[in-house]
Regions:
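Beta->alpha loop/short-helix hinge microenvironment recognizer with preference
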Residues: 1-334
Length: 334
């Protein structure tokens, strides 16, 4: 079931109920997704190089919140990340903003999201350089998600961390010897302190009801590929796949999701306009970078990463350019 069709059907009810809550970046997203593969989005004239047959193809919208677009970009990102994988154990650390501060994130999205990235990455790097933990500079790939599996507003940062780091003083690689990275309760305590200090310095007014205990989840993630695939799902394609939209009946949209605690598939039904708000509230500010690399995985540290790969005897293959899918001619099958 296409999100564009749902947007067309419930557009008026959505605008009537949520227009006062829309942010400036929501409007271009609504416009782009509404025009997906319609004459308003334009068309491409395609000509077969074999028989010369021509036909028109409707264009996609290209918006990163559209579940139909950016498949190629998602694949390219995952290819680039796989080229950086090391033969070590990987870990997935998740830093979550507590419920009491989510209104602050909604009203100051760029600022708070940047603080989430900065405080989460700094916390992990400081734990890594601590001799009691690893005593080395670590690397990580961090991704911002603003939703939980029920699509509610739930800002958090995932960080995929290789189990090892670079000891710059000794010029050697130090490997994490167990399937345990850092103590998640200690991570949460330090992250809380740093975020609150940074938010105060940035001029944000904190509520009196800030919880004393925050949640950081840190777990083993195998060889890293499964965690990267999980994170890649929502980089360029919105927060819900259209195959998860189950039905559109009697003015209600039903979608399915996998419950995190039980891993069982559940369904949730809402009015059409409420479903649209649930999805569109996760549109990020224009130009905001949802994914960021740190440490020896940063784009400016390619030389260091290559040295690490050399030490770990990683076979570096020449990067092959993945081509976009080609059109098949209906006349000559070329």
């Amino acid at each position: 079931m296409q999100l564009a069709a749902i947007l067309h059907q419930y557009h008026d009810a959505f605008q009537a109920k949520y227009s006062v809550r829309l942010l400036p970046d929501h409007l271009p997203a609504i416009d782009a997704i509404s025009r997906w593969r319609t004459p308003e989005a334009g068309q491409l004239l395609v000509q077969c190089s074999g028989c010369g047959h021509t036909e028109w193809h409707p264009r996609s919208c290209g918006h990163r919140s559209c579940p139909q677009c950016q498949n190629h970009d998602t694949t390219l990102w995952l290819d680039r990340q796989q080229e950086k994988l090391l033969p070590v154990e990987y870990f997935l650390a998740t830093f979550t903003l507590p419920y009491e501060l989510r209104f602050l994130a909604w009203d100051n999205q760029i600022l708070v999201y940047n603080l989430l990235f900065a405080c989460a990455s700094k916390t992990l790097k400081d734990f890594g350089v601590n001799p009691k933990n690893l005593g080395a500079d670590i690397g990580m790939t961090a991704v911002l998600h603003t939703h939980n599996r029920r699509l509610e507003y739930h800002p958090h940062v995932h960080a995929v961390v290789p189990g090892g780091g670079v000891d710059k003083a000794r010029k050697q690689w130090k490997k994490k010897k167990s399937k345990y990275l850092f103590n998640e309760f200690a991570l949460a305590k330090v992250f809380r302190t740093r975020f609150l200090e940074a938010a105060t310095e940035a001029g944000l007014s904190l509520p009196d009801s800030v919880p004393s205990k925050w949640v950081v989840d840190c777990r083993h993630a195998g060889k890293g590929l499964s965690a990267l695939k999980y994170l890649s799902r929502y980089l360029y394609r919105g927060v819900i796949g259209e195959t998860n939209i189950v039905s559109n009946q009697d003015g209600k949209i039903t979608f399915k999701y996998v419950e995190s605690r039980t891993e069982k598939t559940r369904c949730r039904s809402l009015k059409g306009e409420d479903f649209l708000w649930l999805v569109l509230q996760h549109v990020l500010p224009k130009g905001f970078r949802r994914v960021r690399d740190y440490g020896f995985l940063h784009g400016n540290a390619k030389r260091l990463l290559h040295l690490v790969q050399l030490v770990l005897q990683v076979l570096i293959q020449a990067a092959s350019r993945r081509l976009r899918p080609i059109f098949m001619c209906p006349m000559c099958q070329a």
